[in-house]
Amino acid sequence: MTDTQNRVAMGYIKGVFGIKGWLKIAANTEYSDSLLDYPEWHLAKDGKTVSVTLEAGKVVNGELQVKFEGIDDRDSAFSLRGYTIEIPREAFAPTEEDEYYWADLVGMTVVNKDDTVLGKVSNLMETGANDVLMIDGEHGQILIPFVSQYIETVDTGSKTITADWGLDY
């Protein structure tokens, strides 16, 4: 089993569908059906982890529905409601150069060109035009567009992002 520190939360089980063990999924991914690319899921809740194998999946009216092996009735499916879906980070597809998964950016330290620590990436958000880093630090929350105009380097080894961003912006 993969160490829990190497797993990324990808969504959660929000409910059941029908009587044959199908589940409704709230995916935290750009495309909800991309979760179907991973045959093995880890489900976590209240310190408990369950490993499951994906048997089938489909998108119905924009909603992801899945069926796990061994979950064959509504009661069994209902017992999984509220579990977080975790996928091992090493199962992700490789990224292109200068392309990053949000999960890899969260937690990175952001510094500006003057080596002033702006804080750590707490989250990202989509704006339609580009993604935006949400940085929490001693200077409060800072929002920096994740575009080459402001982001100079992303060093995944040292977990540091260098930004062309002043404290007075």
Swiss-Prot record:
This is Ribosome maturation factor RimM. The PRC barrel domain binds ribosomal protein uS19. It comes from Neisseria gonorrhoeae (strain ATCC 700825 / FA 1090). Pfam families: PRC_RimM, RimM. Belongs to the RimM family. GO terms for cellular component: cytoplasm; ribosome. It is found in: Cytoplasm. Residues 97-169 form the PRC barrel domain. GO terms for molecular function: ribosome binding. It comes from the Bacteria. The gene is rimM. The keyword Cytoplasm applies. GO terms for biological process: ribosomal small subunit biogenesis; rRNA processing. An accessory protein needed during the final step in the assembly of 30S ribosomal subunit, possibly for assembly of the head region. Essential for efficient processing of 16S rRNA. May be needed both before and after RbfA during the maturation of 16S rRNA. It has affinity for free ribosomal 30S subunits but not for 70S ribosomes. Keywords: Chaperone, Cytoplasm, Ribosome biogenesis, rRNA processing. Its main location: cytoplasm. InterPro entries: PRC_barrel-like_sf, PRC_RimM, RimM, RimM_N, RimM_N_sf, Transl_B-barrel_sf. Binds ribosomal protein uS19.
